[in-house]
């Protein structure tokens, strides 16, 4: 009898072990959960937990927390690739320019999607600057459309690619746990001061309050500690308000040092949605005349304001004696309604192949300087 009881227990344990291992491998180590429609929102995970339950979301999060090693990756291969390149030498006596980096929320030019006719140019200053100005400009590709802004920030600031991380993840939230080499740390090693990040929203969004310091930023201005008055369009801080925060931080640095300045901002003015009226915003300033796309017109009205405010930033540094470089790009294209996409593409976008669908990921970029540089156009590049 004792032997039978022990045997039954051992069999039970064995069955439970097999079920547990099988369940773990299916739920965690495969895409079974995501293939059944579970989307774990990393911007608002609580919503996902409420919708799908703790077990499903927890198992999905385990799968996302361990990136798979890319095919062919090895330290030896990395060293082999990098050995072909040598570092550029920099004259230590040459004055380094101030660097202002702007990633503008949802900034893009929808002409890449279709022939869009509007009542007036929605970014006349930037269009002219890219065509005739003292700048390098072109097209870059975001890894996202309509959301997950922090992934563009991650690629731009670190030089890493989201291509090697699981789809739908946000690097700031899942993978940035220790100090990481970045554009910020590189500039700091060259003697840059300021090294401030400005994002006039909640600091905890996308874990920025923890991610920015790990990337080397000395200061992070959000809407609670900004050094200029908060001015909003709709419910978001204007681009002008954001740029004023940068220039005031720059001026504060100049009271104590003449070392080159670095300031970075992720704006918020143009965030979705694009169909809610506000008393403090003219949503019909730009009208799309050849398509039924009111949300696109609303969005382009925001871009018109962005264009004017960016011109103000350029003019500010035009009138300084210090060499300054300003970089501008967008984090992603806006997420406009499918019906609007149908109207501006005659429905063709629904049948685009992979290469054609890349148009949804195009955003313009420019690098302007207040001193002479070699003007050129870059056909395409990536955020990193």
Language-model segments: residues:
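Solvent-exposed soluble domains appended to multi-pass membrane proteins
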Residues: 83-93, 101-104, 109-384
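N-terminal secretory/membrane-targeting segments
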Residues: 1-97, 117-138, 172-177, 181, ...
């Amino acid at each position: 009898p004792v032997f039978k009881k022990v045997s039954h227990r051992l069999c039970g344990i064995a069955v439970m072990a097999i079920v547990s291992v099988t369940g773990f491998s299916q739920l965690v180590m495969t895409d079974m959960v995501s293939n059944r429609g579970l989307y774990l929102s990393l911007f608002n995970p609580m919503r996902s937990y409420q919708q799908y339950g703790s077990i499903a979301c927890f198992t999905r999060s385990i799968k996302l927390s361990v990136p798979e090693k890319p095919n062919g990756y090895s330290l030896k291969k990395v060293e082999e690739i990098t050995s072909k390149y040598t570092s550029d030498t920099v004259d230590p006596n040459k004055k380094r320019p101030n660097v202002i980096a702007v990633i503008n929320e949802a900034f893009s030019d929808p002409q890449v999607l279709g022939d869009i006719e509007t009542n007036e140019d929605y970014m006349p200053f930037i269009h002219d600057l890219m065509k005739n100005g003292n700048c390098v400009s072109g097209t870059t590709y975001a890894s996202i459309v309509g959301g997950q802004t922090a992934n563009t920030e991650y690629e731009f600031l670190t030089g890493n690619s989201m291509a090697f991380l699981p789809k739908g993840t946000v690097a700031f939230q899942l993978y940035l746990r220790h100090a990481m080499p970045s554009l910020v740390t590189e500039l700091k090693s060259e003697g840059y001061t300021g090294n401030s990040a400005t994002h006039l929203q909640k600091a905890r969004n996308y874990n920025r309050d923890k991610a920015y310091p790990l990337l080397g930023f000395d200061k992070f201005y959000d809407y609670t500690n900004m050094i200029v008055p908060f001015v909003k369009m709709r419910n978001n801080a204007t681009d002008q308000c954001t740029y004023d925060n940068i220039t005031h931080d720059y001026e504060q640095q100049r009271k104590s040092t003449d070392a080159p300045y670095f300031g970075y901002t992720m704006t918020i003015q143009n965030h979705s949605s694009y169909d809610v009226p506000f008393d403090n915003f003219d949503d019909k300033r730009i009208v799309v005349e050849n398509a039924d796309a009111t949300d696109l017109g609303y969005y382009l009205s925001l871009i018109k304001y962005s264009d004017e405010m960016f011109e103000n930033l350029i003019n500010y540094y035009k009138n300084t004696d210090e060499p300054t470089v300003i970089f501008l790009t967008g984090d992603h294209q806006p997420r406009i309604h499918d019906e609007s996409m149908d109207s501006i593409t005659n429905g063709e976008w629904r049948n685009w192949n992979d290469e054609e669908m890349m148009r949804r990921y195009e955003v313009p970029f420019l690098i302007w300087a207040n001193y002479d540089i070699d003007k050129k156009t870059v056909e395409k590049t990536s955020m990193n």
